[in-house]
Amino acid sequence: MGCFPCFGSGGKGEAKKGGGGRKDGGSADRRVARVGSDKSKSQGGLDSRKDAFIPRDANGQPIAAHTFTFRELAAATKNFRQDCLLGEGGFGRVYKGHLENGQAVAVKQLDRNGLQGNREFLVEVLMLSLLHHDNLVNLIGYCADGDQRLLVYEFMPLGSLEDHLHDIPPDKEPLDWNTRMKIAAGAAKGLEFLHDKANPPVIYRDFKSSNILLGEGYHPKLSDFGLAKLGPVGDKTHVSTRVMGTYGYCAPEYAMTGQLTVKSDVYSFGVVFLELITGRKAIDNTKPLGEQNLVAWARPLFKDRRKFPKMADPLLAGRFPMRGLYQALAVAAMCLQEQAATRPFIGDVVTALSYLASQTYDPNTPVQHSRSNASTPRARNRVGANFDQRRLHSPNHQQSPDLRKEGTTTSKYEAEVSRTNSGSGSGRRAGLDSMDVTGSQMGSPAHAGRKRESSRSTDRQRAVAEAKTWGENSRERKWPNARGSFDSTNE
């Protein structure tokens, strides 16, 4: 890559220099003008001149990341011993090491003949040196001695999300529902920072479960920025590039045309979120032919809410909130829409998942399957309704045939949203009474009536409280317009 266009900050604070801590919500104010002089060099063979691969800012000064010698990193990893090996892939190997100050680090040694070349090495150093957020992995430094290319990260003790979802040994406890929602919300915040805070926006392009690393308390951080691209600026709607990424996670429009947008990342996020919910791999060749692709398996199930409970990860053993499952699947389905324009922006996904993550579930509470919860229109989840109300007010959607097909549902949602945002109404008719009340079939009719009224009163109080939460969120955010419709949540 011969030229790296202007890369500025959407935040006010200036990033700390060196390999120190990262400041949430801020990014560097500097602009990067050049990372190399010859595109063919950066993509081709390795240059022995170290200076040719040191990223520099607009003033020609090396960027803030610490520069290590190969000797220092060899000592940190005990000369790259096998017992320090954390993992390996097409890019090379990752080792655990300890710096002279005792700090634990992860050292990624790039394979000189591997998939990640000099261009990807430079991009990753640049991105992680200039972007600072609590949900992005911290780059401590790098090494460009001779033909050696190494990256030094903070050590993430719990490994990757993939390690906790797939091929789990019998003696390992699977992730519970609360932790899964927490990881999803945190990863979405990292993606939101790249899309909305970085200026120009950054498209991650390789969002997958193996690139989400977990720290103490299962705190998620995005890693591996070698494929990241600067997003479109000005009047441009997309950037065109050769198709890169991982099969099973790539958005269909990007895979077919090479046209990349932030919505391409949203699709990839939907795949990972579906992995969290179902426990299935994005691509699993051990499954029957029709179930090998996770998204292809899930699409028909999205249209039948009665099948939603069967989509939950069997390792959860039923320990999840039924309503939370419906809401989570609605968010995943919206992210996975085939048309990029109809997917939500990641900021909207963050709002929805922050709500889901705040609704902690007691794993000792048995799952209650409501008869009407899976089949009646009243069982529509609130997260889906929240996205739908923004879509219904879109001028493009109001002119679409799908709007006419929805019929009375449209006016119902408009009335519900109006009452929700104004804080008026009983709460039950604000689209938030998704859990139907089943009266007691035992005892006298009067007794059954009292039980139903008491239960409905409790539901109303809960609905009003949650309506206020959604109302405040929607007022604080400018909801984007989306074109098209989402049939699976309208059925």
Curated annotation (Swiss-Prot):
Protein name: Receptor-like cytoplasmic kinase 185
Topology in the lipid bilayer: Peripheral membrane protein
Active site (record annotation): D206
Gene3D superfamilies per UniProt: Phosphorylase Kinase, domain 1, Transferase(Phosphotransferase) domain 1
Gene Ontology cellular component list: plasma membrane
Organism lineage string: Eukaryota, Viridiplantae, Streptophyta, Embryophyta, Tracheophyta
Ranges of biased composition (kind: Low complexity): 418-429
Subcellular location as annotated: Cell membrane
Top-rank taxon, per record: Eukaryota
Source organism of the structure: Oryza sativa subsp. japonica (Rice)
